[in-house]
């Protein structure tokens, strides 16, 4: 596996294991299918315009207070990126957008919307809804319409639909059959008008007045104050997630199949995007149990859901073919869950099962879910060990046909260092996926996803994240030198790690051995004896000496803190490099202590050895002779 660039390892052939059968949830999204286009029908009359909503307010509540124009709550915008730089800014911003215009009947919601005149090199238009005053990234855009969007189940929204001839569709959205006339008795003389008209199942003519003087367009919480949602009792679903008592509250869970641990596990901290078919987009993030809820929304009629693999820690992209439109290289990995209807939205279970079709939707989603969980695991374990976590906001590229990886930390280093790597032959080095061929699309980290075993996908992710953590301790100049050393080693030997005689081999040895160490230790903490290799990941580490003869001491760091004196020979990872005994009489150092001396001054194993002796040895109970004997074993 690869580090700055990590070499492929010979591992046993992956095996597939069926997951246990789980109880049938109310709704499950998951299917392997080819890409299908989005098909739109007729344009609908828009009830959410400022003029229409103002008219609706004044007709309902004008006797209390009238407005010339209600304040804008949202803006419907079209993004028109003029360059890949502009699209990248949009993709990284976190704004929810789609590639089709809003306000139309949706005949079929697919994976892409055919836009005329957009060729292979072109960038389509995108559409979104921004809150009033929401900052816009550095992308060309146009405001198509100012909007007022109150909660759906309110008299104001109902009247707005009525005014544009959509009252029947409004009631269909509520699950009814539609009406066209005010029922009797329910006229404007009723104290409870218009609630008795719009919601006769709940309100009669008598009752408290509809108008709430504490909730007007001048209120700070307008328009959300128009409705107060009750917190109803909840039960737990098969995922262990709360199921809201109100079936109209969108909620559910997201899980991924773990092959080695033989079950479904929560997918943590991914974004759920919910669209009501008009101009309302809501988002939620899964918790540690994979649960999500959209508490401030009640759905009516058709709705649509996506899962976007992004959070504050990382954004995942990739899994595209060599002939794809270039802008898609920068898009966040997003899974379209499906269309919902029927009035029940509170128990949606999404499962990402092991893939069969390489490069397909299931492969992409299973890999993205597994990598995201591995990312959170690294953050937890690094905190427990007292080492730096990866930088926030990592840009991670996933590729379907590789088993290696690379941690360039592109967003964290000066462009001059990137240009040095490019001049050294980065794009011709085969260290990056073929489609990554320009400075703009180079990620912080690339991770190969050609695995059908969860622990191996987990392991390479731990390895690359260990590099990103190490980067925070050494800085950009050190990392630039590591990149040049790796490229030189590859050009001289055809191996990214080279061997002991390549220029700056010591830097490669330090960085790759540390990443390999955490790869094994952190994967073992997650999987223990449930793994796809002949023995567990910790034992595999204990039996490993170097990567190649006298180069990259993979097992060294573990021998500095374990309490085992392995009586068997440890072998170099590359077959034919040799084996030998390890004089391991050293114990007690911690990952946090070792990490503290892996800074910009530690550029080879000899310096590392000296710093263990000078900085860590006093008070440890170990001796200089034993430390020297251990290092000499490698």
Predicted segment positions?
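A short, Gly/Thr-enriched small/hydrophobic beta-strand-prone motif that recurs across taxa
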Residues: 12-15, 240-261, 356, 370-383
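Short Pro-Gly-centered beta-turn/loop motif in secreted/extracellular proteins
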Residues: 293-304
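Short, ordered, surface-exposed loop/turn motifs in non-cytosolic proteins
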Residues: 37, 41, 45-55, 59-61, ...
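Short, acidic Ser/Thr/Gly-rich low-complexity loop/linker segments typical of extracellular
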Residues: 276-295
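Zn2+-dependent metallopeptidase catalytic core
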Residues: 295, 351, 355-420
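Active-site scaffold of zinc-dependent metalloenzymes
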Residues: 410-458, 462-475
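Bacterial Sec-dependent N-terminal signal peptides
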Residues: 3-27, 206-210, 216-220, 229-246
